[in-house]
UniProtKB/Swiss-Prot annotation:
Protein name (Swiss-Prot/TrEMBL): NADH-ubiquinone oxidoreductase chain 4
GO BP field: ATP synthesis coupled electron transport; electron transport coupled proton transport
Keyword hit for Transmembrane: yes
Organism: Formosania lacustris
Protein family (similarity comment): Belongs to the complex I subunit 4 family.
Record's bilayer topology term: Multi-pass membrane protein
Keywords: Electron transport, Membrane, Mitochondrion, NAD, Respiratory chain, Translocase, Transmembrane, Transmembrane helix, Transport, Ubiquinone
Major place of residence: mitochondrion
Gene Ontology molecular function terms on file: NADH dehydrogenase (ubiquinone) activity; ubiquinone binding
Taxonomy, superkingdom: Eukaryota
One Pfam family of this chain: Proton_antipo_M
Length: 460
């Protein structure tokens, strides 16, 4: 654990002491080195139950893929932000990268934590840098509104979790995951226990987000700068799914009956948010709603609590993290050139930027879960689990996949195909930096296709 945590903490003096000329290249290189070191975790993830580096930080097959994703994302965020942060004063540039690095530190400690209370503190700590990034570097004035939504939804959701954890500590005497998974199941019988069960899960369902408590997500995504959107889509939503998987161990006997309404909401959310996507005009908003739809599938897979459901959920979380982050980067490159997020105003970009159209195409196909890609693997596993649990769910999940394919192709056709409007003739060309950024997002997705067992979680 420390082989990644210490270099990440060493990023802070690097950011503040590097000469302005070398700031971006140094931090990107440093971030990529950390990302490469973090890949060594994947090697051991499947053989051992829990590779413990200390009593408080450990990595097991469930957290390892998410830790790798977190480390992989920092250099990509730095690469993506370079264009629109460079004109600002050097102090602000340093502060921006510091916030991104602090976010990575908190996330590594959240995914590696063995104590649930440590996980909770880090889960909450990620809120602060994200909030500053959205409200300080967002594009429109609505960013303050988005920040308020984000703050209040997350805080209101996670306060019951704190109370629930303190109660669990009181009854069990420990909050260590290493001990809790071997302790006796709790005899949860009364109404109070049912409220406690809901308190444990509601924070994660708001973070996922479950349909119904998802309103903060489109706002936060649309108003955040590109790095904010990337880290929000790729890792912060996955904190919710990861936390649910960890807590399910403790909540066992009650989940059988109480999970029903949440599964129904998640499945209904797949259809509803997909339908909203079909009517979107705003590029980033469409990608944000598609995230809600995918995470609904993940929530359903986790709440059913079968090995296949868990495996499908973690595969879909990793694949969706890379793909939605790539889509946000592409949306940002289009926004930086045309200064508009409305899809109708920027059509026919394939004629001007053919290689970028290829990146759009791959990202959209991955988003709609094209066969050999890991997205399909995760979705199929979850859909199979849901079908096994109740055959009627195939109506909802089947319609959901159909709508997903519909809006993904709609997004591609609207932004890339069609006649090029007269007002977009003199656009600056794409940089190698942007092509590298897209390659670093999409090549891992294609490579995971060849060895999916590194992200199968416990079930391998």
């Amino acid at each position: 654990m420390l082989k990644v945590l210490i270099p990440t903490i060493m990023l802070f003096p690097t950011i503040w002491l590097t000469p302005p000329k070398w700031l971006w290249s140094t931090t990107t290189a440093h971030g990529l080195l950390i990302a490469l070191i973090s890949l060594t975790w994947l090697k051991w993830s499947s053989e051992v139950g829990s590779a413990t580096s200390s009593l408080y930080l450990a990595s097991d097959p469930l957290s390892t893929p998410l830790l790798g994703l977190t480390c992989w994302l920092l250099p990509l965020m730095v690469l993506a932000s370079q264009n629109h942060i460079t004109p600002e004063p050097i102090i602000r540039q340093r502060l921006y990268i510091t916030l991104l690095a602090s976010l990575q530190t908190f996330l590594i400690m959240a995914f590696g934590a063995t104590e649930i209370i440590m996980f909770y503190i880090m889960f909450e700590a990620t809120l602060i840098p994200t909030l500053i990034i959205i409200t300080r570097w967002g594009n429109q004035t609505e960013r303050l509104n988005a920040g308020t939504y984000f703050l209040f939804y997350t805080l209101a959701g996670s306060l019951p979790l704190l109370v629930a954890l303190l109660l669990l500590q009181q009854t069990n005497g420990t909050l260590s995951l290493l001990i809790l998974q071997h302790s006796q199941p709790l005899a949860l019988t009364s109404w109070g226990h049912k409220i406690w069960w809901a308190g444990c899960l509601i924070a994660f369902l708001v973070k996922m987000p479950l349909y119904g408590v998802h309103l903060w997500l489109p706002k936060a995504h649309v108003e955040a700068p590109v790095a904010g959107s990337m880290v929000l889509a790729a890792v912060l939503l996955k904190l919710g799914g990861y936390g649910m998987m960890r807590m399910m161990v403790v909540l066992d006997p009650l989940s059988k009956e109480l999970a029903y309404p949440f599964i129904i909401l998640a499945l209904w959310g797949i259809i509803m948010t997909g339908s909203i996507c079909l009517r979107q005009t705003d590029l980033k908003s469409l990608i944000a709603y598609s995230s809600v739809s995918h995470m609904g599938l993940v929530a359903g897979g986790i709440l059913i609590q079968t090995p296949w459901g868990f495996t499908g959920a973690i595969i879909l979380m990793i694949a969706h993290g890379l793909v939605s982050s790539a889509l946000f980067c592409l949306a940002n490159t289009a926004y930086e050139r045309t200064h508009s997020r409305t899809m109708i105003l920027a059509r026919g970009l394939q004629m001007i930027f053919p290689l970028t159209a290829v990146w759009w195409f791959i990202a959209n196909l991955a988003n709609l879960a094209l066969p050999p890609l890991p997205n399909l693997m995760g979705e199929l596993m979850i859909i199979t689990t849901l079908f096994n649990w109740s055959p009627l769910t195939i109506i909802l999940t089947g319609t959901g996949t159909l709508i997903t394919a519909g809006y993904s192709l709609y997004l591609f056709l609207m932004s890339q195909r069609g006649p090029t409007p007269k007002h977009i003739v003199g656009l600056p060309p794409f940089h190698t930096r942007e092509h590298l950024l897209m390659a670093l997002h999409l090549i891992p997705v294609l490579l995971l296709m060849t060895k999916p067992e590194i992200m199968w979680g416990w079930c391998y």
